[in-house]
Structure formats: C-alpha cells, structure tokens
Amino acid sequence: PDFTEDMLYGKYLPNESGALYYREGFITQLMPTKDKNYLVIDNFNRIDPDIFQTYINVLEGYEVTLPRYNKDGSMIKWSKNKDSFYHFNPNWHIIGVTYDSIEDIKQKYSQQFLKYTRIVRVNHSE
C-alpha cells in the first residue's frame, strides 16, 4: 500500500540506544496546529479508505484512543474536545490528487470524510 495507518497516525520506533519513541504520522503531526494546514496526497485513489477510519471517527464526534501514552502514563485521546491531546482542527484539510473520476472517489469514500477532503482530478497525458 502507498499509505499505512502508521504513516498517517504515527508509530513507535527504536532510537539508537534501543529505547522506543513515538514518531508522529502525517495527520497527527499537522492536525493539532491552529493555523490552516493541508496534507496533499498524490495518487489518492490508491489509498485504502479503511485507513482513514480513525480520522472519520473523530470527524463524526467520537473520541479515539491512540496507542500512545502521556507523560502521566494515560493513553492519548483524539477528539473534537478542546482538552483532547490531539484536537480536531476544522481549518485542516486533506487534498487528494487523483486520476480517477470524482464519481469513483465519491463511491469509495464516505460523505463525512469527503466533507473535509478536497479532491483534485488530473487528466492522464497521452
């Protein structure tokens, strides 16, 4: 796959001494900022829509627990709640660049997800 959940939401990796640290994913790194931000994904049509389920759950108002811990040992939460470690930023959007038709993309991805995603269709060069 072109994108994995680890790439979008982050994962634990060993450092040089063998201790684990959490490397942010594209979404978790950009989402908490207060400014308008974009994540541009080329060949968007090649991404399995299931890997966006965590993001969609937050968009739909659910609180999601990520496999990451705060300094106090509690699991990190992501929600629309302003006190959440990762707070949903309504000024943040995914831009998907695709060769597929917009109709194909609408069939593949949920309406809630597409509300926060901008799709740009490019033509194949002959």
Question: What function would you assign to each model-found segment?
Answer:
Residues P1-E126:
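AAA+ P-loop NTPase catalytic core and its hallmark functional loops
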